[in-house]
Each structure stands twice: as structure tokens, then as C-alpha cells.
Amino acid sequence: MQDTHISLAHGNGGRYMRELIDEIFARHLANPELDVQADAVPIDIDGGDILFTTDGFTVQPLEFPGGNIGSLAVHGTTNDLAVAGAIPKYLSLNAFIEEGLAIDVLLSLIHI
């Protein structure tokens, strides 16, 4: 990877993101059992496989017609599991919280 700093291009799903994943994360954090590069990975737990995935979303505005970033995150993540043939039972949390976000806005997005 030629870049010396992370840019927005590294998060857009294209070539720069692939280079970042392959040359930084996969190279240094490789795990052959998890290295399937799919939306959901099978993990053997106590003799039974589960499918695990986590996803991250950013969108502006945080609330939009028909939903908000919270509903987008839940539906996007459970969709990754469903298309892999799993029945979603649990969710992991991957939160990108911008500096200056009002706590009330955060609470409204997670429905507390």
C-alpha cells in the first residue's frame, strides 16, 4: 500500500478499501478459520456452527424517511446473516460516533 495516511477513499468499498484490508488488517491479523472474506463467517462453538457478522454504517442525516441509522444497522446486519442461511439471534454493536453528537440523539437512535 503506497498511502501514508488513511483517507475517506479507504472506506468507500473500492480499491483503496481492499488494499487496506489485504495489506494491513489481513496481513497482520490473519486467522485461517475466519479468513473467508464473506459477509458472515462460520464459527465452531461447542461443536455447533454459528454464523457471525458485524457491520458498520454511516449516513447523513441520521434520521431519514422510513428509518434511521439504528434501523439501517439492524436490518443491514441481519440481512447479511439471512442471505447466508442463518437465523439471526444476537447482534454485535459497531458504533461510529462523531465527536459532538448530542447524547439525546444517540439515545433516540438506540431507543432508550
PLM regions with names:
Residues D55-T58, N94-A102:
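Acidic, glycine-rich active-site loops and adjacent beta-strand->loop/helix elements
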Residues T77, L107-S108:
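Alpha-helix boundary/capping detector
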Residues G14, L93-N94:
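Alpha-helix N-cap/helix-start and coil->helix boundary motif
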Residues L81-S92:
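Short, flexible active-site-proximal loops enriched in glycine and acidic residues
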Residues I110-I112:
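Conserved small/polar residues in nucleotide/adenosyl-binding loops
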Residues M1-V83:
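N-terminal glycine-rich phosphate/pyrophosphate-binding loops that anchor nucleotide-derived ligands
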Residues E63-P65, L101-L106:
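Short, solvent-exposed loop/turn segments at secondary-structure boundaries
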